[in-house]
Amino acid sequence: MHNKTVRHLTILILTIAGIFIIDQNIKSLFVDGYRYYSDCIDLILVYNKGVAFSMFAFLDESLKYIQLVLVFGVFGYMLYLNQLCYAIPAGLMLGGAFSNIYDRFIHGGVVDMVYWHCGFDFAVFNFADVMIDVAVVWILLLNFKPKFCKNHS
């Protein structure tokens, strides 16, 4: 393996592991009973059976296997690209995705806890969801502004 590949893989795997560990630790607080209520944001426990905004909840048990295939596909594609500039954003995305899929296997649904209701009701979400959103924006930026990625080809 080339140094570039080893470095890319190391950064990718460490980022995935870091996001997974942080997210699962946050979620364990809520599974264990922590709650917080305020005028704008409540921290509550919700098990989301679907994906964003509970879409595809009708897929029930199949959803976690479909997501697993998609996530391993993205992981494989990131390895194929072997672009160092994608290692951290891909790690954020994959770490969040693996954590949410893990929830489906362990809890029967994704553990969500942040409920924004200041001015309007927003979907309940978690740290992994935020990391996935940040990663998508970062990856789009790298794709549309190649100058941000020195080894972008």
Swiss-Prot record:
Biological process terms in GO annotation: proteolysis
Ion transport listed as a keyword = no
Q: Name one GO cellular component term.
A: plasma membrane
Q: Which Pfam families match?
A: Peptidase_A8
Q: What is its EC number?
A: 3.4.23.36
Q: What class of enzyme is it?
A: hydrolase
Where is this gene product found? Cell inner membrane
Q: Which GO terms describe its molecular function?
A: aspartic-type endopeptidase activity
Q: Where is the signal peptide?
A: none
Q: Which UniProt keywords apply?
A: Aspartyl protease, Cell inner membrane, Cell membrane, Hydrolase, Membrane, Protease, Transmembrane, Transmembrane helix
- What is the active site of this protein? D112, D129
Keyword Cell inner membrane present in the record's keywords: the answer is yes
Give the transmembrane region(s): 11-31, 39-59, 68-88, 122-142
Tell me the membrane topology, using the record's own terms.
Answer: Multi-pass membrane protein
Give the catalysed reaction(s), semicolon-separated.
Release of signal peptides from bacterial membrane prolipoproteins. Hydrolyzes -Xaa-Yaa-Zaa-|-(S,diacylglyceryl)Cys-, in which Xaa is hydrophobic (preferably Leu), and Yaa (Ala or Ser) and Zaa (Gly or Ala) have small, neutral side chains
Q: In which pathway does it act?
A: Protein modification; lipoprotein biosynthesis (signal peptide cleavage)
Function per UniProt: This protein specifically catalyzes the removal of signal peptides from prolipoproteins.
The protein's matches in PANTHER family, at most eight in alphabetical order, are given as: LIPOPROTEIN SIGNAL PEPTIDASE (PTHR33695:SF1)
Instruction: Please give the family membership noted in the entry.
Output: Belongs to the peptidase A8 family.
Q: State what protein this is by name.
A: Lipoprotein signal peptidase
Identify the species of origin. Sulfurimonas denitrificans (strain ATCC 33889 / DSM 1251)
Please state the gene responsible for encoding this protein.
lspA
